[in-house]
């Protein structure tokens, strides 16, 4: 079989004139060899990150840990729940430990789908944070390696320089800003492989690498993969433009191949992807609102200036892209434009792609499209890693022709770059830019230009070592200055052992229960410590449940809801039977102390409603739960149930930004702030001062137990806003009344597992069996062995209609879309395998055909030794024409077969 050599994506001059073939000794030192480029691209970023961790005192080098933003609040708890399920044999389809009960298959797909995450099974529970940290460092190193490997495929020979560019890809401004976002990193490290796979698909008609790597990227994180897929469409068009013109059939075939393998890659991930898509439709992000008017956030000059190193990264609500990838890009980009060895068509295409990204960073509508037809809630320009990839590749192309670059071009590039930096100091007004960064950038530019001059003067022995040192220093300084913020590991894990002991003491449980920590570290403490809980902070949060929480006076937002603001009545409805306190509190008629472990206290709520109970059929019509005041909503449910109001008006006086009231009797007090412009409130209590943040989210402010006769004063931080508020005292007697009314026909569970519930209910009369299970179409309910239709109660919960009498109820859960997605994935795998075998068979047939031709020619020569064999005249072709000829003949052979 004839071996087809690797084809460079970018059309170059004949092999003999290749720049890399004229500099085999470039950057070779006793310490560094050209083949070391790949090792450098992996190990230097890893060592840089380890050094930064040592300097920051990150465990085991100190008491700190690398838990930043979502890694603190979401990733660590979800990793803990994932590990817990793997070790205990729990279902990966549903979890009661997160937000009242969630579709864990969707949560897994969104946060945990990286295949590397399964290694957590080998990690001790107490080192989950360190497992995540190690995975981040490993993925950063692999990102550098994959990009260097991609560049190596374009240089034909091992050259040390691929390692330098790999370092900047791994330690770019994007990584500095988002390296903590472990669920994105798989897509970053796979991206160079995907792009190379697409190039092979277009050049060599081989789609296996493209399909598998893109499928793995989509599986690992669908969100970043949306941006990858959008770019692949653009890059596919770019590759066709850079191809040598051919017949229309050639372009049609390429488009068909691209479409088939792209669909197959999505199909490979469908088993994970479809349940996630269905779940996301029930989130607040499920809405679609394309911008009505187009606008620009900032000028292109300011964006380009963010290539300067040591500039503070942007992860907030501003839209600035994090695009730093070494200040040398200023030099190399100008050298790229000036290089006569690089085709004008190529320059036009790649510069066009860069302009598209600049427009996407700055124009609101394009920003909306790139982020999956949504505006990002902080963490801007999440597609900027693609821009960095393009910019570094462009610069590498200039680097490949450094031998042919005149010294005057280097001088012009340096002075042009230096002038831009000085101009940026004058024009850029962002607070991210400290004045010193401009001068540091010029120093590094001068150092890079000096190295180029040394190289051009023939002093190449030390150039490789000096270049590596300079690149490592620049990248590490930027990473150290702009990245790796830390928090206290001790404070995050301080009470873990105590909580574990107390929650384990509740097992085995005879009936369903939920637990809440009154002093939480995150809204996902249940997932972190593996106990059934109520609160949740996740992008997969159910929007209807968030709205219902707010109606009852609990804290909620776009992607979170929590028990903050709940009354004992709300706790009872949500089956919160146990509470964990960080300090001892007195027993009441409603709550009883159970046990304590090293300063953590476990209490039982004595009047907790079961997971399900029968309500009258007309309660949804009678209960006015759409009112603005959550206290009135709770009281109305009491009245509808035939009980007294649980929240009694305690009066109070409003005076500008203050609200005061005096308790008339001992009890637990709450305040509801009606002015939504007030965000922060300070309460002066007999026990001291208490602060409340995010008050505009509409939750009840819990003031605790207050004695009569002592004035309580609340003050809004917003001095110009009037603190319109109402104070309430919680009535324990009314609570017992309403509990007795609602608990007349409870559901008693006989079995309780992740995806299956069984129980009995004795309904005094026909009604609605309400459950505090969030509504999900994945639930199937059977009554007395017969499947019944489920419905959404109060806009958020799972319910069914039951007749009077005794019934056996069975619940089972299977995520919507999982079966269909699994079938699609299985079918895609089969098709991909068939395509692989088909291609191998075609190549074998072609090889056999050629061998047969050779044997025939040999036989003819033996039969008539005097006759000279005739050979087909082969035209004189250059590398590019030869490549096209081979590819066209292979395509023709495939069509015939």
Predicted regions mapped to residue ranges:
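Extracytoplasmic/lumenal acceptor-recognition loop(s) of multi-pass membrane glycoenzymes
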Residues: 470-490, 504-574, 607-610, 614-636, ...
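Active-site-proximal, structured, solvent-exposed surfaces of multi-pass membrane proteins
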Residues: 30-32, 78, 639-872, 894-897
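Hydrophobic alpha-helical membrane-insertion signals
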Residues: 24-102, 487-527
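Membrane-embedded helix bundles of polyisoprenyl
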Residues: 45, 136-154, 158-243, 254-277, ...
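Start-transfer (signal-anchor) and selected internal transmembrane alpha helices
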Residues: 1-58, 253, 257, 457-467, ...
């Amino acid at each position: 079989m004839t071996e087809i050599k690797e084809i460079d994506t970018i059309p170059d001059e004949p092999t003999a004139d290749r720049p890399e073939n004229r500099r085999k000794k470039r950057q070779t030192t006793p310490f560094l060899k050209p083949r070391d480029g790949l090792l450098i691209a992996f190990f230097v970023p890893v060592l840089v990150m380890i050094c930064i961790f040592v300097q920051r005192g990150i465990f085991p080098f100190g008491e700190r840990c690398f838990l930043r933003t979502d890694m603190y609040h979401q990733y660590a708890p979800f990793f803990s729940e994932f590990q817990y399920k793997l070790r205990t044999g729990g279902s990966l389809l549903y979890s009661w430990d997160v937000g009242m009960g969630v579709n864990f298959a969707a949560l897994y797909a969104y946060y945990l789908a990286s295949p590397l995450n399964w290694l957590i099974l080998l990690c001790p529970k107490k080192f989950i944070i360190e497992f995540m940290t190690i995975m981040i460092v490993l993925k950063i190193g692999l990102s550098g390696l994959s990009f260097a490997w991609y560049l190596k495929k374009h240089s034909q020979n091992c050259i040390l320089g691929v390692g330098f560019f790999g370092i900047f890809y791994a330690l770019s401004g994007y990584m500095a800003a988002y390296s903590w976002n472990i669920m994105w990193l798989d897509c970053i490290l796979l991206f160079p492989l995907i792009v190379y796979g697409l190039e092979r698909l277009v050049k060599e008609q081989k789609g296996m690498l493209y399909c598998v790597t893109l499928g793995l990227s989509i599986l690992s994180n669908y969100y970043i993969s949306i941006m990858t897929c959008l770019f692949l469409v653009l890059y596919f068009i770019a590759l066709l433009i850079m191809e040598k013109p051919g017949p229309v059939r050639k372009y049609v075939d390429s488009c068909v191949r691209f479409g088939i393998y792209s669909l197959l890659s999505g199909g490979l991930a469908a088993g994970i992807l479809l349940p996630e898509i269905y779940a996301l439709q029930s989130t607040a992000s499920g809405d679609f609102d394309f911008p009505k008017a187009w606008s620009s956030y900032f000028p292109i000059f300011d964006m380009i200036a963010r290539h300067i190193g040591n500039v503070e990264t942007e992860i907030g609500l501003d839209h600035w892209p994090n695009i730093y990838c070494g200040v040398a890009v200023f030099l190399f980009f100008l050298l790229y434009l000036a290089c006569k060895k690089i085709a004008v068509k190529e320059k036009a295409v790649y510069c066009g792609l860069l302009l598209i990204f600049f427009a996407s960073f700055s124009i609101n509508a394009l920003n909306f499209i790139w982020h999956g037809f949504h505006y990002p809630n902080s963490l801007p320009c999440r597609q900027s890693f693609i821009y960095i990839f393009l910019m570094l590749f462009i610069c590498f192309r200039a680097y490949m022709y450094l031998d042919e670059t005149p010294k005057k071009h280097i001088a012009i590039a340096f002075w042009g770059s230096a002038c831009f930096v000085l101009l940026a100091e004058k024009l850029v007004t962002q607070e991210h830019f400290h004045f010193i960064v401009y001068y540091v950038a010029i120093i590094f530019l001068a150092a890079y230009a000096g190295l180029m001059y040394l190289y051009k003067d023939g002093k190449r022995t030390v150039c490789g070592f000096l270049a590596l040192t300079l690149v490592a220093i620049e990248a590490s300084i930027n990473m150290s200055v702009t990245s790796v913020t830390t928090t206290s590991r001790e404070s995050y894990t301080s009470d873990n052992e105590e909580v574990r002991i107390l929650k384990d003491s509740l097992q085995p449980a005879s009936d369903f229960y939920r637990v809440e920590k009154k002093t939480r570290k995150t809204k996902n403490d249940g997932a972190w410590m593996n106990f059934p809980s109520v609160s949740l902070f996740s992008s997969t949060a159910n929007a209807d449940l968030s709205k219902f929480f707010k109606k009852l006076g609990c804290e909620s937002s776009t992607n979170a809801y929590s028990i903050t603001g709940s009354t004992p009545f709300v706790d009872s409805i949500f089956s919160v039977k146990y509470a964990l306190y960080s300090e001892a509190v007195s027993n009441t008629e409603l709550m009883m102390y159970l046990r304590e472990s090293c300063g953590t206290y476990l209490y039982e709520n004595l009047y907790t409603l079961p997971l399900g109970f029968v309500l009258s059929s007309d309660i949804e019509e009678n209960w006015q739960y759409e009112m603005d005041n959550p206290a009135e909503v709770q009281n109305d449910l009491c009245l509808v149930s035939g009980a007294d109001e649980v929240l009694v008006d305690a009066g109070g006086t409003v005076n500008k930004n203050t609200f005061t009231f005096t308790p008339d009797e001992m009890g637990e007090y709450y305040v509801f702030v009606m002015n939504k412009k007030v965000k922060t409130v300070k309460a002066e209590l007999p026990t001291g001062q208490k602060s409340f943040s995010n008050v505009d989210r509409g939750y009840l402010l819990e003031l605790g137990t207050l004695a009569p006769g002592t004035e309580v004063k609340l003050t809004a931080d917003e001095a110009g806003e009037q603190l319109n508020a109402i104070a309430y005292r919680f009535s324990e007697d009314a609570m017992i009344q309403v509990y007795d009314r609602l608990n007349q026909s409870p559901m008693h569970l006989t079995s309780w597992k992740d995806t299956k519930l069984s129980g009995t209910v004795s309904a005094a009369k026909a009604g609605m069996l309400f459950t505090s299970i969030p509504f999900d179409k994945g639930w199937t309910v059977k009554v007395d062995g017969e499947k019944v239709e489920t419905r959404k109660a109060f806009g958020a919960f799972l319910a069914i209609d039951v007749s009077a009498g005794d019934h056996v109820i069975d619940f089972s859960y299977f995520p919507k879309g999982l079966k269909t997605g699994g079938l699609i994935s299985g079918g895609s795998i089969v098709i991909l395998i068939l395509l692989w075998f088909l291609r191998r068979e075609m190549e074998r047939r072609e090889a056999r055909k050629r061998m047969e031709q050779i044997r025939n020619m040999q036989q003819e020569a033996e039969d008539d030794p005097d006759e000279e064999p005739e050979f087909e005249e082969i035209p004189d072709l250059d590398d590019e024409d030869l490549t096209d000829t081979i590819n066209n003949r292979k395509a023709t052979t495939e069509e015939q077969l």
